[in-house]
């Protein structure tokens, strides 16, 4: 069994490599994303909180290419490159955390409901239908407003309340297909426990789909966090994010006369999300190919 899983994992890695070789855009996107994450996290490790919290009025709104400030400064006299790195790190951290929770909850619930089916599955799906029709953005904003001592973990928890639904339904649908395959029926006949069948036999066969779903969920969470921060309902005051940088554009004067304060963050979000989507589409094709050949 261990040898078989090892071969499957090698086959998965090989399939992904081959797809990236064929899809040059996805390959370039992968290299770009790795470079962005390395630069953002390594750079931010050497910054102190005072670097992006302290205000220097004397350096307010310095134009790009000013000595010591390649992309200029913002309304607090803070270097745009520095703020871009810190903001990107904070936005990525929120997106990573929500994506992790989404995948864990979505995979567990999706596999369980898809495997057992029946009345439990019917009731659970009606519950997810109800959650999906709720105005999630408005509810998130209300929670952000009323929760005392709101912080980053609060935001992660609030977003995660609604984020797992789509992943759960996707994993459930694929699990229901796997349940009818011969290897599952053979395991049931041999007396293998339901837990082992679900998470040691069925779930590994969903790995490509899970990876593809993770990339797209991550891109969506970056967009959601950015949107909330742009509206003023994201990360708490004093914690910069890409959304708070773009919020500078809400001032008409700043939008037209000082575009360097918000354009860099907009470009980063656009390129990063597009790169993640290109990678996710390539991984989705790998998942579909592996499913078709089984």
Curated annotation (Swiss-Prot):
<keyword id="KW-0812">Transmembrane</keyword>
<keyword id="KW-0472">Membrane</keyword>
<keyword id="KW-0571">Peptide transport</keyword>
<feature type="transmembrane region" description="Helical">
    <location>
        <begin position="94"/>
        <end position="114"/>
    </location>
</feature>
<dbReference type="InterPro" id="IPR035906">
    <property type="entry name" value="MetI-like_sf"/>
</dbReference>
<dbReference type="GO" id="GO:0055085">
    <property type="term" value="P:transmembrane transport"/>
</dbReference>
<dbReference type="InterPro" id="IPR050366">
    <property type="entry name" value="BP-dependent_transpt_permease"/>
</dbReference>
<keyword id="KW-0813">Transport</keyword>
<feature type="transmembrane region" description="Helical">
    <location>
        <begin position="27"/>
        <end position="47"/>
    </location>
</feature>
<feature type="transmembrane region" description="Helical">
    <location>
        <begin position="260"/>
        <end position="280"/>
    </location>
</feature>
<dbReference type="GO" id="GO:0015833">
    <property type="term" value="P:peptide transport"/>
</dbReference>
<comment type="subunit">
    <text>The complex is composed of two ATP-binding proteins (OppD and OppF), two transmembrane proteins (OppB and OppC) and a solute-binding protein (OppA).</text>
</comment>
<feature type="transmembrane region" description="Helical">
    <location>
        <begin position="127"/>
        <end position="147"/>
    </location>
</feature>
<keyword id="KW-1133">Transmembrane helix</keyword>
<dbReference type="Pfam" id="PF00528">
    <property type="entry name" value="BPD_transp_1"/>
</dbReference>
<protein>
    <recommendedName>
        <fullName>Oligopeptide transport system permease protein OppC</fullName>
    </recommendedName>
</protein>
<keyword id="KW-0614">Plasmid</keyword>
<dbReference type="InterPro" id="IPR000515">
    <property type="entry name" value="MetI-like"/>
</dbReference>
<feature type="transmembrane region" description="Helical">
    <location>
        <begin position="151"/>
        <end position="171"/>
    </location>
</feature>
<dbReference type="GO" id="GO:0005886">
    <property type="term" value="C:plasma membrane"/>
</dbReference>
<feature type="transmembrane region" description="Helical">
    <location>
        <begin position="202"/>
        <end position="224"/>
    </location>
</feature>
<comment type="similarity">
    <text>Belongs to the binding-protein-dependent transport system permease family. OppBC subfamily.</text>
</comment>
<keyword id="KW-1003">Cell membrane</keyword>
<dbReference type="GO" id="GO:0015031">
    <property type="term" value="P:protein transport"/>
</dbReference>
<comment type="function">
    <text>Part of the ABC transporter complex OppABCDF involved in the uptake of oligopeptides. Probably responsible for the translocation of the substrate across the membrane.</text>
</comment>
<feature type="domain" description="ABC transmembrane type-1">
    <location>
        <begin position="88"/>
        <end position="280"/>
    </location>
</feature>
<keyword id="KW-0653">Protein transport</keyword>
